[in-house]
C-alpha cells in the first residue's frame, strides 16, 4: 500500500539535518546512514550517501531519477551466488 498524499515522505530527522548542513556548505562529504526506510527527496540530489546493507555501508550517488524511492532499494542485502553446479555427491 502506498503512503497517503496528505502525509509528507518519511525522511529520518538525523539524515535531514546532515543534508541541510551540507547544502549550506559548499563541500561534498559522504553521509553514512543506517536509515534504509528514508525516502529520497530533491534536496538529496548530488550527495553521496553510504547506505548500510547489514554488513557494510555502500556509497550511492543520488541522481534526479532516484527521487521518490527509498534508500534501501539501492543497497541490496542478499547476495545470491547461484545454485550448486553438481549435486550428485550429496545424493550418494
Curated annotation (Swiss-Prot):
InterPro entries: Ribosomal_uS19, Ribosomal_uS19_bac-type, Ribosomal_uS19_CS, Ribosomal_uS19_SF
Pfam families to which the protein is assigned, alphabetical: Ribosomal_S19
GO terms, biological process: translation
Main location: plastid
Keywords for the protein's UniProt record, in alphabetical order: Chloroplast, Plastid, Ribonucleoprotein, Ribosomal protein, RNA-binding, rRNA-binding
SUPFAM superfamilies, per database record: Ribosomal protein S19 (SSF54570)
GO CC, alphabetical: chloroplast; small ribosomal subunit
Cellular localization per UniProt: Plastid, Chloroplast
GO molecular function, one term: rRNA binding
PROSITE patterns linked to this entry: RIBOSOMAL_S19
Family to which this protein belongs: Belongs to the universal ribosomal protein uS19 family.
Function as written in the Swiss-Prot or TrEMBL entry: Protein S19 forms a complex with S13 that binds strongly to the 16S ribosomal RNA.
Protein name (Swiss-Prot/TrEMBL): Small ribosomal subunit protein uS19c
